Swiss-Prot record:
Region feature (Luciferase 1): 114-465
Cross-referenced InterPro entries: Calycin (IPR012674), Dino_Luciferase_N (IPR007959), Dino_Luciferase_rpt_sf (IPR044902), Luciferase_cat (IPR018804), Luciferase_hlx-bundle_dom_sf (IPR044903), Luciferase_hlx-bundle_domain (IPR018475)
Organism taxonomic ancestry: Eukaryota, Sar, Alveolata, Dinophyceae, Gonyaulacales
Organism, scientific name: Lingulodinium polyedra
Domain writeup: Composed of 3 homologous Luciferase domains: each of the individual domains are most active at pH 6.3, and there is very little activity at pH 8.0.
Protein known as: Dinoflagellate luciferase
Keywords: Cytoplasmic vesicle, Luminescence, Oxidoreductase
Subcellular location: Cytoplasmic vesicle
Length: 1241
């Protein structure tokens, strides 16, 4: 029997043998029946993960890794499959009726009289029926309508139904979410698709999502047609409207048809929508997010619910469609819709009551066989959202793609058809054309074009929607409960709640910092009289310096209600996944030239010393005063306000995932708040902190925002501004800031801010965008011509704080002058009148004026500025990316981020001394340097993806791969058979003494020819497969020594001695740390060969590398496909070109990268294994050397004379010099001389 179980798990379940062995020996499962009955249907999803995979190596090292997730998914599928086996028991949990409840059916209709749902069927599956809800309260379903009686305080309170108490009403809705979607056996599959949640379908969905995002054939001209919306007045007119009365017209007038909607008339021939469909993307997680957006759920509750429901499948969302030509009855989840089914006809309005108590009017049109296009009015908001559903066959399955557009943003959900039988019954057709069209035929669309329609209900003369009629009172009650669920109030500028761990900034948070430091909602700390560098006491606690106090204040108000930083949209903003994305985004940002103010090239205004002096002592609290320096000029290039965002994309809580405390400390040093010695001490004290603490809580309502931010910089926790209008901020430093935000489009805001004490203006752009499952906000700040980037991730759609009233400072900042000009003299449309006029004073500032002046004096005399060297900041001597601690012992051999060792004047074969240590030869020194920067943080080579790259398992794989590589004939450059270019002796001589640091010079030898057979660039990788840390598992030191002998750097006698000395070393030391973002990569590699530790390149563009030997290298990498890169490299001292191909691929649980290098017709292979998805190093800005290498010539030819499409212009033009090389030119020339005279080749 055990053998039968093993055979089933391995052959049918494709479960890993290690997991199977544990089940047989560890859990002592002896038969298929044992496996099938080991968990209940309620527990198996968690069970296979917690009881098996979490106990089996290597999966238990990180259950979030793809390999572990795959095994969990396969075991779940195997357990479900085992339920159908003859020897397996089926431990399904049937719902139990409440005592006294009876399920009765009407003989004629087949519907239950009490619930209005279908009678018959089983409790654990099938179409929604009376048996499935018999365990709930008697009145949870009546007349076919779902009307749960939630707690009067809202859905976040516990809810009891059928004797069972749910933690919240939302937990109840989650259970209701799946009602009616399962098959008769309690599963989701069916005859057309047995397992809709299999890994194969998950992979298919990922491919379909990528295809969908590139599709430009969506309805409404790819959703570019304008979408109608009701005015506030129209929404108000419909308040209290009786949607149950079919004889009434909408009081707001007819709803406009969306422009671009096709007309009905087509009648499908094959009924392709008919059947049962299960969601295979979206599901419960998406449902929770939507509920948060809709105000049904707050941040703390959603966080808890997400944790409770992690074990659930994606599914639960479903469609049961009875299609008969152009008429459909559709069953869908009762968690959102109040009733389980509705029947509609193509081109006619239908009505839906929502569980939230709201009202929806919508239309589906079937313009062709496999497509339906719809739009839906949410009458409480006046918004219209548009949808397209498209059915198609893929891999033997029928898929339906749903594209939903709300306010210009398109999202996709996919369904798979699991059965041609919807397993539910149709209900009679009714329509709401008369009401929705307000009795008017041929109502126009949103562009004024008449649309063929008749304002008469299809079920006329029926006068009332009886289902709604029976439940009107309950629906109104639900709407009230949902609307008031999470209301909070504001108290003297702080939120009124008593959670000391997290939430918006409140009195409970600041109590420990001393009430005297927070007054009237203003942060006014009492620093030491001598400045911030002196100790201070607050709330009975003594801080080493005022800055230590500010660091603690820095993250006040940014945490969630549990005291962490995450939220329902992003649980771990400091996890590897998000941090990896951020590193890629930083690389992309550094090459972006689309920033505001013409990429910040427009001149930035600045006040003169005289104007700054005029404003000294100005009373910024008095809103009736004009600035004595005259109106502040608008920065040239600022867009004008007027656009009103439709979707409020900034609304929510955002956490900084780059920058944070370390960046805050650096900024404090720059601004003179903190000196170097103090900074080192503080950084040491705060290393244990997360990056975060910096945060934004934004309440957005169109063009008006209330923003909560760190009180470490701003004296008050929140401010409200309107697009295009000045607001005022007192700073903790005692300074004064006047600024403006403009919202020129949906996902972007552009601002500028005047620091009135210095007269400086700094400009900012914030841009929101999705990346993977997350929403990021990129902040680009320009000060003095330098652009820096900070990234935020949205962790919750709930800001967790409340807005405060709007005020502005237009009169003061514009000195009473309308249409004040920008700094180029061009008038900017504006009115110099405060939005909150006739308010005369800023009361908050007025109350705290004395404290602010005192703070300004203390900050101004604190410290001076410092600057850092050119290696990554870090203090880990054992490992990590190359940092100052690694190279500290090598003294002046590392300067300005460059490796420039001082070898013996007679050559590398002679002894040398570095940092007090004597090396037998320069080459022994280089061998030690060879490993710098390649190790993990613990000083080893492994990582989470491969713990032991030099273990027997990986080495056996590598030996096999080396043998396979020798017989591979699919290498680049036509298997390296295409001729390889080479410079002539004359060309090499021309380049002697060339200044490679000058980016404005052309190579004197003419353009370097492209190697024949090189693919053209243009492909942009989607998954960044090269991103991470790679360790060499073949080649390494031994290969490095051999190459040194060949190149003349080392003779045979010395080589024999060195090989004997280094035999005890691992193969490794050679490594790659790659930060990949699409077709741009920053690569860290060994400083034993390359003089600098890292370089950034873009596919198809030349980059330059100075070599430790003193030579110069110009090369190109091209990324022609997802897992491959092809390159060539010119050694300018020899004139030789060597060609390389790197190819990444999975083998077993590992990802390998094979490097094929061709020099002089001979091919050699080196293999790397990826040990971590985190490169553990930072990217640097992109630069290129196209102009120099191509000698200023576009479309330079290959060595066979064929033009290659190129542009001879550097990507970082107009930058004129390579600064790193410039600082080290003299030393590089010296090294070249020493290396060249070492040995005979």
């Amino acid at each position: 029997m055990a053998a039968q179980l093993e055979q089933f798990l391995v052959n049918e379940g494709q479960v890993d043998q290690r997991a199977v062995t544990y089940m047989l020996k560890g859990l002592q499962l002896e038969s298929l029946s044992d496996f099938a009955s080991f968990w209940t249907s309620k527990d198996y999803e968690n069970g296979v993960r917690d009881d098996i995979i979490s106990k089996v190596a290597p999966f238990n090292s990180d259950l979030s890794l793809p390999a572990a997730k795959l095994q969990v998914a396969r075991l779940r599928a195997a357990w479900r499959k085992a339920q159908g086996k003859p020897s397996a028991a089926v431990p399904l949990q049937s719902a139990k009726p409440v005592a006294g409840s009876v399920v009765t059916a009407t003989k004629d209709t087949g519907f239950c009289e009490k619930t209005g749902l279908e009678s018959g069927g089983v409790a654990h599956g099938g179409a929604l029926n009376a048996a499935q809800v018999a365990h709930l309260d008697e009145d949870a379903f009546k007349g076919g309508l779902h009307r749960p009686k939630f707690d009067s305080e809202g859905l976040h309170k516990p809810h009891t139904s059928g004797g069972k108490t749910y933690e919240t009403g939302f937990h109840y809705l989650l259970e209701a979410h799946e009602l009616g979607g399962k098959n008769a056996d309690g599963g989701f599959g069916g005859p057309l698709c047995a397992d809709p949640f299999s890994p194969e379908i998950e992979q298919l969905c990922q491919a379909l999502v990528r295809e969908a995002q590139d599709d430009k054939t969506l309805c409404f001209e790819n959703f570019t047609k304008p979408c109608p919306q009701l005015t506030k007045k129209q929404v108000e007119l419909c308040k209290g409207f009786d949607y149950g009365d079919k004889t009434l017209k909408l009081p707001c007038g007819p709803l406009p048809w969306p422009a671009g909607l096709p007309e009905p008339g087509y009648v499908p021939k094959t009924n392709p929508l008919h059947g049962r469909w299960i969601t295979v993307s979206g599901g419960q997680a998406a449902f929770i997010k939507e509920a948060i957006k809709a105000g049904m759920l707050g941040a703390a509750e959603s966080h808890k619910i997400m944790a409770d429901t992690d074990h659930h499948q994606t599914g639960g969302m479903y469609l049961r469609i009875n299609q008969n030509g152009d008429v459909c009855t559709v069953d869908a989840s009762v968690a959102k819709f109040a009733r389980a089914k509705r029947t509609w006809k193509s081109g006619h309005y239908f009505y839906e009551p929502l569980v939230s108590g709201g009202n929806l009017l919508g239309v589906w049109v079937l313009p062709e066989e496999y497509r339906k296009i719809g739009f839906f009015w949410e009458m409480e908001s006046g918004r219209c959202f548009r949808i397209e559903r498209r059915a198609f066959e893929r891999n033997g399955l029928m898929i339906m793609r749903q594209a939903t557009e709300v306010a210009g943003k398109i999202s996709f959900v996919f369904y798979v058809k699991v059965s041609n039988d919807p397993e539910s019954k149709p209900i009679p057709l009714q329509s709401r054309d008369y009401t929705a069209l307000a009795g008017l035929d041929n109502v126009p669309d949103s562009l004024g074009n008449p649309y063929t329609c008749e304002a008469k209900d299809l079920d006329y003369p029926i006068k009332r929607d009886t289902w709604l009629d029976k439940n009107q009172e309950e629906m109104l009650k639900q709407r009230s409960i949902v609307g008031t669920a999470f209301a909070k109030c504001c108290d003297q500028g702080f939120e009124a709640h008593d959670n000391p761990k997290g939430g918006a900034l409140t009195a409970a948070h600041v109590e420990s910092l001393g009430k005297e430091n927070f007054k009237n909602g203003l942060h006014a700390p009492n620093f030491h009289d001598d400045g911030l560098h002196k100790p201070m006491e607050a709330g009975g606690k003594v801080y080493s310096t005022g800055f230590h106090y500010l660091l603690e204040a820095h993250d006040l108000g940014g945490k969630n209600e549990d005291g962490g930083y995450g939220g329902p949209l992003c649980k771990d903003p400091y996890g590897k996944e998000v941090q990896s994305m951020v590193e890629n985004l930083l690389v992309q940002a550094n090459v972006d030239t689309t920033n505001a103010f013409d990429n910040f090239k427009q001149p930035c205004p600045q006040l003169t010393k005289e104007q700054v002096a005029m404003c000294k002592g100005f009373d910024y609290g008095d809103k009736t005063l004009k600035l004595p320096c005259g109106p502040l000029p608008w920065p040239a290039g600022l867009p004008e306000p007027g656009y009103v965002p439709k979707t409020n994309p900034l609304h929510g809580r955002w956490i900084t995932v780059s920058g944070g405390q370390v960046a805050f400390i650096k900024e404090a040093i720059k601004s003179g708040m903190l000196g170097a010695a103090e900074a080192k001490k503080i950084i040491a004290d705060t290393d244990h902190h997360q990056t975060g603490g910096m945060y934004l809580r934004i309440n957005q309502y169109g063009e008006v925002c209330t923003v909560d931010a760190s009180v470490a910089k701003f004296a008050r926790a929140k401010r409200t501004w309107k697009s295009g209008h000045y607001f005022y901020e007192p700073l903790v430093s005692g300074g004064n800031l006047l600024g403006v935000w403009v919202l020129p489009e949906e996902y972007r805001k552009i601002g500028f801010f005047w620091e009135m004490e210095s007269g400086h203006c700094f400009r900012i752009e914030r841009r929101a965008f999705p990346c993977g499952p997350y929403m990021f906000l990129r902040q680009a700040t320009e000060v003095g011509g330098k652009i820096s980037y900070v990234f935020y991730v949205k962790v919750s759609n709930d800001p967790g704080s409340k807005p405060i009233p709007l005020q502005s400072r237009d009169y003061t900042a514009l000195a009473g002058q309308d249409n004040a000009p920008d700094n180029l003299g061009k008038p900017y449309k504006c009115t110099a009148r405060d939005l909150d006029a006739p308010t005369k004073r800023d009361g908050w500032l007025d109350t705290n004026k004395g404290a602010m002046l005192d703070q300004r004096e203390k900050v101004s005399k604190a410290f001076a500025k410092v600057c850092e060297k050119g290696f990554e900041a870090g203090d880990n001597k054992l490992g990590g990316a190359l940092n100052a601690k690694h190279v500290e012992k090598y003294g002046d051999n590392f300067k300005n981020g460059m490796h420039k060792p001082e070898f013996h004047e007679d050559g590398l074969h002679k002894p040398m001394e570095v940092g007090g240590k004597k090396f037998e030869s320069g080459f022994h020194y280089l061998l030690e340097c060879h490993e710098l920067g390649g190790k993990n943080a613990s000083g080893g080579y492994g990582g989470p993806l491969c713990e032991d790259p030099y273990g027997s398992e990986v080495q056996a794989m590598t030996e096999k791969l080396l043998k396979e590589a020798d017989s591979d004939r699919t290498l680049c450059f036509n298997n390296f058979q295409d001729p390889c270019p080479q410079l002539t002796k004359e060309q090499v001589a021309m380049c002697k003494g060339f200044d490679y640091g000058d980016k404005t010079l052309k190579l004197p030898c003419g353009p370097l020819p492209w190697p024949a057979g090189l693919p053209e660039p243009g492909y942009v990788p989607k998954t960044n497969p090269l991103h991470g840390r790679w360790i060499t598992v073949s080649g390494g030191q031994a290969a490095f020594i051999k190459e040194a002998i060949k190149s003349g750097m080392l003779g045979a006698a010395e080589a024999n001695k060195i090989v004997a000395d280094t035999d005890h070393h691992q193969t490794g030391g050679m490594y790659l740390r790659i930060n990949q973002f699409g077709d741009v990569c920053t690569v860290d590699a060994s400083v034993a060969k390359f003089a600098r530790a890292k370089r950034t390149w873009k596919s198809g563009h030349y980059f330059y590398e100075p070599l430790v030997s003193g030579g110069n290298l110009l090369g190109v990498w091209v990324l022609p496909e997802e897992y491959r890169k092809i390159g060539f490299f010119w050694e300018m001292e020899s004139g030789r070109c060597f060609r390389i191909e790197r190819r990444a691929f999975p083998v077993g649980p590992y990802t390998f990268m094979r490097q094929a290098t061709e020099v002089g017709g001979k091919i050699s292979f080196v293999f790397y294994v990826k040990v971590s998805n985190d490169p553990e190093s930072d990217p640097i800005p992109l630069q290129s050397r196209d102009y120099t290498a191509l000698a200023g010539r576009d479309n330079a030819p290959t060595n066979l004379g064929k033009p290659y499409p190129t542009l001879a212009k550097d990507l970082d033009y107009p930058k004129k010099r390579d600064g790193w090389l410039e600082k080290n030119e003299k030393e590089m020339l010296r090294q070249r001389n020493i290396v060249s005279s070492t040995f005979r080749s």
